[in-house]
Each structure stands twice: as structure tokens, then as C-alpha cells.
Regions:
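Pyridoxal 5′-phosphate
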Residues: 311
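Surface-exposed, glycine- and small/polar-enriched segments that build interaction surfaces at terminal
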Residues: 455-457
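Sec-dependent N-terminal signal peptides of Gram-positive bacterial secreted proteins and lipoproteins
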Residues: 1-23
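Ser/Thr/Gly/Pro-rich low-complexity, disordered linker/stalk segments of secreted
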Residues: 519-556
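Acidic glycine-/aspartate-rich tracts in secreted/extracellular proteins
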Residues: 459, 475-479
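Catalytic cores of secreted/periplasmic lytic hydrolases that degrade extracellular macromolecules
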Residues: 22-303, 314-451, 462-468, 481, ...
């Protein structure tokens, strides 16, 4: 009896005070005998058991009782499977034929927003379930959208997610704020034992609006002390009950425009890489290549390096070693090693990445990959179309943080930065000057909330919504001396390659942006510009409908 009491108290301690997720596996839930002929309403107890509450003739009856009863642990069960829950997360599957799961804008699945893979982290907030189709509305990595229940809906094969009621979760992915930093803790599978935490990364310096402690968030901007409150807000489409509802967090490294310059030089980069790698690494001694690419193509060297470290495992992955490919370029999830692009040299890879993939695509308004000029998340930024990892932007930001910490944070908050304060369409155009015309006949505009700019000056201009302040900012696209940006044919065929003009700026109305830092740093317009050789012509520079370059799941 004493042994049983000890075990009981030990298990209670685990459930209440550990950073883990416990639940019945999908197989265990499915093998449970059905308690009702059609629909069962059950209570999901914290020990992983399901206790019948009542039987119903249809889903709608059970749903109504579930939503109007005080019991927060209620779930709807059919044929031994949980098909809905009052408050729950989902565990999305990592084993699909494509290697990822699409997220769609609406239940009709007519428009793909982005894509995710459970190979990295597999829990998301469950907002809504459509019983008839099995499709569900979720939030993960900042994006809200719908996913399918089955990879093949016609045959109902390959289930893409399981519903995990929050009574079975004690700590899914969560953020830890310390006295000096913010850390993201990941679990790769919500059913793993408590000692199987996948990874933890420091993504930035301590957010000023958050006290030390543990928090939940599926966007990295608004944080919650408990999952129930988070889910209530998500279901209501707001952040009213988050701990920072009036002051969202924008991690400097995730929301720094690529059209910026680092304060570090080639020697600094080589010093850092010398401390983190060996001479066998493909990143070893690449400082000059990164700085030259920054100066010529207008892309922050440390942001590029951070992506390279994340994608190549510090230059030691098989793709980087055999193909000189530091950035996972074309390493699609289904066949990363086979599909990844080969380069003649590491410097060729760095130059192609800056010129073709960043300046030519991800930073080019009008390209289907353009969602803003920063790392961002699955809602906004490069992360939307670059990678299937919902937290790819945070992981790249982690390496920028590591580099910056190594040298005493000389880049952190250097610039005055701001983010677009809402979604806009055909509203926020970049101007040649506050009183002038839009930049380019192609109408370069900012659309997605969170799109980042660096503010180089504040000037007065025409009043917009009662505000006469305009921001002078660096341009997302590469523009020419006439403030036009290039068509694909001109951009890719010109020799030597077209360089970014650091002395050309654009202007945007301040009323549409929220300032997040006040660093006041300036752009060096007199950088040494070294024309870089053209490795190989781009055989198909125009955007294709295929998925964007996708990093390999883990460094090989």
C-alpha cells in the first residue's frame, strides 16, 4: 500500500509539475471499446483515460452539450476516436508522401497559405473542427488556417492529425523568459515521455514586456500563462487575455529587414566560425564571401550566415559537404539530398543565394514567395514559403543571437525598426519621396502585418489619416537609379550582375507602422562594392508553382 501511495504521488507530481505532454497514443484511443452506438461525449481525465458522460444520436447534440457544460475536459468520440474537443491541441503528422502538410485559408482548401512538417515540432492550437469533412482550423507559427484530416480524402487514408485535449497536456512547446533572454522549448512528438524533449533554443534577448516565467504562444508575439486562455482567445479571433495584449513582442532578429548591414566584418565572422567549427566545415573562413555578398547584393551578411548555419549544421551536413549548398536550396522535404542544388564552390552558393533566391525572389514584391523582407514566421516573412518548419525563422534568429552575443551585442537594436501594424491591400505603397510617385510601375507595397522596415529618418509629408510623418527606409526590391525595380529578364541576364543601390531609399507613411526599436543606426552608402562572378545562368528565373526551396529536415 505504501508503494502504491508513493507511485500515485509521484505520478501526480509528474502530471502537475513537469514540462511534458502526456496522452493516450492514437492507437490506444482507437483500441478503446466504443461506449456508445453513435456519438459519445466523454471526459478526458489527466491520467489519460476517457470516462463516458453520455451517448447522443448525432454530433450536433454532443457539440451543444460540450460547449454549454462547465467541464473543460469534454471530448466527442466516435468509433473509439476523438473527433472534437472543447479545448485541445492537435498533433500533426510528420509522415506524408510529400513530407509536409498544407495549410489553407478556408475550409474549401481553395488557397494554400503555407506548409508545415511534424519532423521538427508537431503541436498546434485547435480552433475549430468541421465534423463532416474532418478538416480543422488551427494556429501554428503565427498562421491561422485549415488542414485536411486525411492526406487522401477520397479514400480516407493517412490521417494527418490527432486531437489532444489539454487535460492530457502539461507542457507542449513553450517559451521561457529569463532575466536576460527568451528561450523556446520544443517537443517533437506530444506522446513522448517527459525526458524526451526535442530541443531548446535561445531566440533573442528578454522581451521588455514579459516577466520571467513560462508562457505559451503559437505566434511568438502574444503570450499566455495557460493553454485554456490561449485557446479561448484564438477561438474568438483576438489576443485580449494575453499577458501582453497591448504590447506584442517582435524579436529583433526575426523582424530585422534583410536590407540592412551588420556592424561585423569578415574577420569577426571568421573569428566566430573558428570558435564554432573546424577547418572541415564548409563555412570555415567564409567571412569575406558573406560581407562581399552583403555589400553588392544588399542582404545582411549575418542574416545570411544564420540561415546557412541553421540549414547546413555549421557547414557539416552532407548536402553542404557534397554540394557546397549551405542554404538547403531546393532540398525539398521528400528528397532533400537528391534534389538539393549543387554549386561549384561555397562562394558561388553564397552569391547565388543573395542574388537569385533573396534579392530576386523572396525580397521581390510580386514574386509568390514575397511576404516581407524579414525572417518572420509562418504568417509573414521568409518562413512562409522557405521552409516547412513552423519555427524556421526563430531557429535562424537563434544563430544571429548567438553570433551577436559572442561579440557583445553590437548589432542588437542598432537600427530603428518598425513593423506593419495590420494587413493591408492596395494601401501601403512605397514612394520615391513623400510628395512623389509610387516606387516602380509595378506598385511595390506592404501587405502583411509584421512586415519589417528599418527607419533611417523621419520626414514630413502629406497627411495620411491625420498623420504627416513619413519614414525613410531601405527598399525591399533591388531598384535602379530611376526608382524602378527590374523585370526578371533584365535582372537575371544583365552582366555583371545587378547590385543593390544602398543610396536609394523609399518613403512610407508612418501611420501604417508600429515602431519597435529606436536604435538610430545608419546605412553606410560608401561600402566597397566588389562585382561577384556569375556562377551559372539561371535556367528558369520566373517563379514556378512548385513549393519554394525547402531545407532538409535535419543536417545530414
Amino acid at each position: 500500500m505504501k508503494r502504491l501511495l508513493f507511485v500515485s504521488f509521484f505520478l501526480m507530481f509528474i502530471f502537475l509539475f513537469t514540462d511534458s505532454v502526456y496522452a493516450l497514443s492514437a492507437a490506444e484511443v482507437s483500441s478503446r471499446n466504443s461506449e456508445c452506438p453513435v456519438i459519445e461525449l466523454a471526459s478526458a481525465n489527466s491520467d489519460g483515460s476517457l470516462v463516458k458522460v453520455g451517448c447522443y444520436d448525432n454530433y450536433e447534440q454532443a457539440k451543444n452539450i460540450m460547449n454549454t457544460t462547465d467541464n473543460d475536459n469534454l471530448v466527442i468520440v466516435q468509433d473509439g476516436k476523438i473527433v472534437d474537443a472543447k479545448y485541445a491541441l492537435i498533433d500533426y503528422d510528420q509522415y506524408t508522401s510529400l513530407g509536409y502538410t498544407n495549410i489553407y485559408s478556408d475550409i474549401s482548401l481553395s488557397n494554400t497559405l503555407t506548409y508545415i512538417s511534424g519532423s521538427y515540432s508537431d503541436d498546434a492550437a485547435l480552433i475549430e473542427v468541421d465534423y463532416n469533412s474532418g478538416r480543422c482550423k488551427i494556429k501554428v507559427g503565427g498562421v491561422v488556417g485549415w488542414i485536411k484530416k486525411y492526406e487522401n480524402e477520397a479514400n480516407k487514408t493517412n490521417v494527418l492529425y490527432d486531437i489532444v485535449p489539454i487535460s492530457w497536456t502539461t507542457s507542449p512547446n513553450y517559451y521561457q523568459v529569463t532575466d536576460d533572454s527568451i528561450i523556446h522549448h520544443f517537443y517533437k512528438n506530444v506522446y513522448l515521455p517527459i525526458d524526451k524533449k526535442y530541443s531548446s533554443i535561445t531566440i533573442g534577448r528578454k522581451p521588455s514586456m514579459l516577466n520571467p516565467g513560462n508562457y505559451y504562444s503559437y505566434d511568438g508575439n502574444y503570450f499566455y500563462s495557460d493553454l485554456k486562455t490561449l485557446l479561448i482567445d484564438y477561438k474568438n479571433g483576438n489576443y485580449n487575455n494575453s499577458v501582453n495584449s497591448n504590447n506584442p513582442f517582435y524579436n529583433y532578429y526575426q523582424y530585422l529587414s534583410f536590407r540592412s548591414q551588420t556592424n561585423y566584418n569578415a574577420d569577426n565572422i571568421n573569428q566566430y566560425l573558428g570558435a564554432r567549427t573546424t577547418s572541415n566545415s564548409k563555412l570555415y573562413n567564409t567571412g569575406k564571401a558573406f560581407i562581399d555578398a552583403q555589400n553588392y547584393y544588399g542582404v545582411n551578411a549575418i542574416l545570411m550566415l544564420a540561415i546557412g548555419i541553421n540549414e547546413s549544421g555549421y557547414g557539416n551536413s552532407s548536402i553542404s559537404q557534397t554540394k557546397n549548398n549551405l542554404f538547403g536550396i531546393n532540398a525539398v522535404d521528400a528528397s532533400p539530398g537528391q534534389s538539393a542544388t549543387s554549386f561549384n564552390s561555397v562562394s558561388d552558393c553564397i552569391n547565388d543565394f543573395a542574388f537569385k533566391y533573396l534579392s530576386g525572389r523572396f525580397l521581390q514584391p510580386g514574386d509568390f514567395r514575397y511576404f516581407g523582407a524579414n525572417l518572420g514566421n509562418k504568417y509573414q516573412g521568409l518562413t512562409v514559403k522557405y521552409a516547412s518548419d513552423a519555427y524556421w525563422g526563430e531557429k535562424a534568429a537563434h544563430y544571429y543571437y548567438d553570433i551577436d552575443e559572442y561579440f557583445g551585442f553590437q548589432d542588437y537594436n542598432y537600427y530603428s525598426t518598425a513593423v506593419l501594424n495590420s494587413d493591408y491591400n492596395n494601401t501601403v505603397y512605397a514612394k520615391k519621396d513623400p510628395n512623389g510617385y509610387n516606387v516602380s510601375s509595378k506598385y511595390y507595397q506592404y501587405r502583411k502585418k509584421g512586415s519589417a522596415i528599418i527607419i533611417l529618418d523621419e520626414v514630413k509629408g502629406p497627411s495620411v489619416n491625420g498623420n504627416t510623418t513619413w519614414y525613410k527606409v531601405t527598399s525591399d526590391p533591388t531598384i535602379d537609379g530611376n526608382m524602378e525595380y527590374y523585370d526578371d529578364n533584365t535582372y537575371y541576364s544583365t552582366t555583371p550582375r545587378i547590385n543593390y543601390l544602398w543610396s536609394k531609399y523609399v518613403y512610407v507613411p508612418a501611420v501604417y507602422f508600429t515602431k519597435i526599436t529606436n536604435g538610430g543606426g545608419k546605412i553606410n552608402e560608401n561600402l566597397v562594392i566588389i562585382p561577384t562572378p556569375t556562377p551559372t545562368p539561371d535556367p528558369s528565373p520566373s517563379p514556378s508553382p512548385t513549393p519554394a526551396p525547402t531545407p532538409s529536415p535535419t543536417p545530414n
